[in-house]
């Protein structure tokens, strides 16, 4: 489960067995978790985060999208 980025309490990562899915990033903080598709950036699923946190996470994903895609492509190619 490669961690790509940490920002505050948020950890951005993907699972090493998810190469068959489109590029995406998971975000975890404590017991809360979300998954964002990267092309385009869209929330796929969320458990525990409130709407304010999801807005913040979406902005972080958009700001680091190229970094996440680069990590994804390097890992799975």
Set out the residue ranges of the language-model regions.
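A short, structured beta-strand/loop element
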Residues: 15-51
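Feature detects long, helix-prone N-terminal segments enriched in hydrophobes
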Residues: 11-13
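Generic preference for hydrophobic/aromatic residues in regular secondary structure cores
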Residues: 4, 43-45, 64
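Intrinsically disordered, low-complexity segments enriched in small/polar residues
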Residues: 8, 45-47, 73
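Negatively charged, low-complexity tracts enriched in Asp/Glu with abundant Ser/Thr
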Residues: 1-9
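C-terminal structural segments of small proteins and small subunits
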Residues: 49-77
């Amino acid at each position: 489960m490669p961690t790509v980025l940490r920002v505050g309490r948020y950890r951005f990562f993907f699972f090493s067995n998810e190469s068959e899915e489109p590029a995406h990033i998971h975000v975890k903080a404590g017991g809360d978790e979300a998954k964002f598709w990267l092309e385009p950036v869209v929330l796929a699923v969320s458990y525990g985060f409130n709407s304010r946190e999801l807005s913040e996470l979406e902005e972080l994903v958009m700001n680091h999208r190229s970094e996440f895609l680069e990590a994804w492509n390097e890992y799975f190619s």
